[in-house]
Amino acid sequence: MIRSASFRAIGATALLGLGLGGLFASACRQKAAPAPPMATPSVTLSREKVPLGGPVDITYKFVVAAGATFTQNYRVMVHVVDPNEELMWTDDHDPPVPTTGWKPGQTVEYTRTVFVPVYPYVGDATIQVGLYGQPNQPRVPLAGEDMGQRAYKVGRLQLAPQSETVLSVFKDGWQAPEAAEHNAAVEWHWTKKVATLAVKNPKRDSVLYLDLDNPGGVFEESQQVTVSTAAGTPLDQFTLTPKRATLRKIPLPAAALGADDNVDLRIAVDKTFVPSRLSPSSKDPRELGVRVFHAVVVVLAP
């Protein structure tokens, strides 16, 4: 009886071992080796603490793996998430050099200026980067900390209250604000021939980030834009081409801003237009100059 019982126990153990071995072998066969990373992403920020609504220059860098070959063009996915991994905003974009032009071992580096949305949150945020193609395709494997679905953690950003930015007010010479039909976060003001931006004088060397365009369609002529102080001190002059968004980073020396607590900056254009006079289908009687999306003063670090 003991021998028989021992036999049955040994037989059951052997069968169990064979069964588990088969399961492990099957699992090993089913689990594919991870795909090798195609590149290593990283970002560098011009400043790590940014007030809501303020600009930050983000330098993206991709170090292409030695054996990597990109056979299609991918977009760069940029997600900014809060500590609970909730998505706050995105900055997806096409890299200036299409990924089919990336070479093994090459370093691809470029800088974009992002204006932080006025989001109902202040505190730490995480920047995630990825590469994606068609909607149903998996994202490209990259080297780094995968936060899920090949979204890789590349940096952190501290969001500060909007009150920490230099106060500026659209004073005179502006049309009422407008917003994009399908994205209320995209807002702009049209100028008239001369528009005044009232700024609380930082009394330090600063930079005016002026983000503007002429969308074209109705008015297709280039415009000369001049930025100066109310006292007439010239700060910048440039040509604005229709259908081409322009970001000007205009130096504001403390000496040019003067000693008053507030200073007016003037944006003047040489040509304005009235849509209803140029297009029979338009009923817009306003005088329009250029379309300004952002006009933000940033104090330079000491």
Residue ranges and their predicted role:
Residues M1-R8:
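N-terminal secretory signal peptides that target proteins for export/translocation
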Residues G11-G22:
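Bacterial N-terminal signal peptides
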Residues C28-P302:
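C-terminal luminal/periplasmic domains and tails of membrane-associated envelope-modifying transferases
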